[in-house]
A protein has these predicted regions:
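A C-terminal cap/extension of S-adenosyl-L-methionine-dependent methyltransferases
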Residues: 184-236
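A short acidic, Gly/Pro-enriched loop at the edge of an enzyme's catalytic core
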Residues: 86-95
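A short glycine-rich, Lys/Arg-flanked "PGG" loop and its adjoining helix->strand segment in the class I
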Residues: 109-124
Length: 236
């Protein structure tokens, strides 16, 4: 297994990796009885969770991640990228998920145009993306690396531990000429990434921090300083 994939998997299994999914699943709880496309499905954690009450198709280009996929509930898994979905009929899906993917894509517009084609009118596009303010806060407070934070402010891409360079982007600009309208956004990782990891193994930490994150995830200014932002867009 490639070292970066192993690091990513180990991080997900830590309390600070698990709570990300606790928060995300709470924000996706209204998705039931839908046909769902999870584009860039990774280890399949979100696809597997939603497959309990939905018909889910997952697409992931990394074969190592697919080999380690979670599949407690039945869903279809394809290995690939746009090549796997270009043959699908128009308006094939009620919901499309694209979580922490577009930072690593060269031509985001091409991907989003394809999502627009595949979504039914009124359908939901769920995008989780890095938030530049949250990036800088974590770098200064948790990592204590002011030079790296200054580099981020100057426009330098973020070097992630497992997935390489993550390039920030303006979602409003990317979708401005598409039939996609931002409905709302929520924060993920408002507080927990700013804490020292030694606190995160304490009994009850995950449960209490989840309550705190969910209490503010829909509120400004908290959602505006989160490391991740979860956008919901509607297909017009």
């Amino acid at each position: 297994m490639a070292a970066n994939i192993q690091t990513y998997l180990e991080n997900i299994r830590k309390p600070w990796g698990q709570i990300y999914y606790d928060i995300l699943f709470a924000q996706l709880k209204d998705i039931k009885g839908k046909r769902v496309l999870d584009f860039g499905s990774g280890f399949g954690l979100v696809a597997n969770h939603l497959a309990k009450e939905n018909q889910v198709l997952a697409v992931e280009p990394n074969e190592e991640m697919v080999a380690l996929q979670a599949q407690d509930h039945p869903y279809q898994q394809l290995v690939g990228s746009l090549d796997q979905i270009e043959s699908f009929e128009d308006a094939s899906f009620d919901v499309i998920l694209c979580h922490n993917v577009l930072e690593y894509v060269e031509d985001r517009k091409v991907v989003l145009k394809e999502f627009t084609r595949l979504l039914k009118p009124g359908g939901l596009l769920s995008i989780v993306k890095h938030n530049e303010v949250g990036r800088v806060l974590q770098t200064v407070v948790f990592e204590n690396d002011t030079q790296k934070a200054l580099d981020l402010l100057a426009g330098q891409d973020l070097e992630t531990h497992s997935m390489g360079l993550a390039q920030a982007y303006d979602l409003d600009r990317v979708v401005e000429d598409l039939a996609l309208e931002v409905q709302d956004y929520q924060g993920i990782r408002v507080f927990y990434a700013l804490q020292d990891n030694r606190f995160k193994g304490q009994e009850g930490w995950r449960e209490s921090m989840l309550k705190m994150e969910l209490a503010v995830c829909q509120e400004s200014p908290y959602r505006d300083i989160a490391f991740f932002q979860h956008y919901r867009l509607k297909r017009s």
